[in-house]
C-alpha cells in the first residue's frame, strides 16, 4: 500500500491510498477518514459508495461528512466506483465502463477480467482495512445513486455483515430502468434471470425476515432522474410487503447533486451510529 495524500481534518486524518487489487487485477485507490482516537476501543466503519462518473474523492471533498464522523468516532471508507487503468475495458458513455462499475461481478468479456467490484467490496477491501487500520469489525454501508444501488445490494446479499444501510437517490430497480438495463446487458449478458441477483427490489422480495436491517433512504423531489431511473416507491412497496424496516424520506426541492447529500449526510451518520456504536 502507498499513501498518496494525508490531511489533518477535525482532529482526525483524511487519507488517500493506492493498493494492488488481486480481485480487480489493477491498482485501486480508496480514501479513508480516521476520526480522532477516543480510547482503546477500535472504531466502527461506514463504507460509502459513490455514483456514476465518480471516484473515491467526490464524497471526501463535497459531502462534508468528516465533522460529524469525527464527533461520533466513525471511520469513513470511500472506495473507487470501478477498476481503472489503460488495460481495463472502458466505454465512451458516462454510464458504462470506468467510473460505472455498478458494484457487481461482470460475467461477459471483456468486462469479466476486471469488473468484480462486488467481490472487492465484500472481501478484499474490508480485509485490507481490517489488517492495515485499527478498526472494529462492525460496519455499515451507504451510497448515492449507482452507489445507493451498491449499498442496498451489498446489505441484501450479505445478511449479518452490516448493522444498517442507507442511500441517497438510489437506483433501486436496475432491471427496469435505462441505466440498469444498459449496464446489466453489457456486464451480465441478455439472461435477465441473472440480473435479478443484482436488483434491490428482487433481493428484498426474496429476503428472510430475520435478515432485515434498519434502512434509510433520502430522495429529492426535484431530482431530474427520479421518474425515469430511480423510482424509490418500487422499493418502498417491496419493503412494505416484506415488513422491512425502511424509512423513505422525500425531500422537497432537492436534486441529484452533492448539495443534496451534504444537506442530509449528518442525519445518515447519526442513523448509522445508533447501530454501529451499540
Curated annotation (Swiss-Prot):
Pfam families: Esterase. The keyword Calcium does not apply. It catalyses: S-formylglutathione + H2O = formate + glutathione + H(+). Its EC number is 3.1.2.12. GO terms for biological process: formaldehyde catabolic process. InterPro entries: AB_hydrolase_fold, Esterase-like, S-formylglutathione_hydrol. The active site is at residues 145, 223, 256. Transmembrane segments: none annotated. It comes from the Bacteria. Serine hydrolase involved in the detoxification of formaldehyde. Hydrolyzes S-formylglutathione to glutathione and formate. Belongs to the esterase D family. This is S-formylglutathione hydrolase YeiG. It comes from Escherichia coli O1:K1 / APEC.
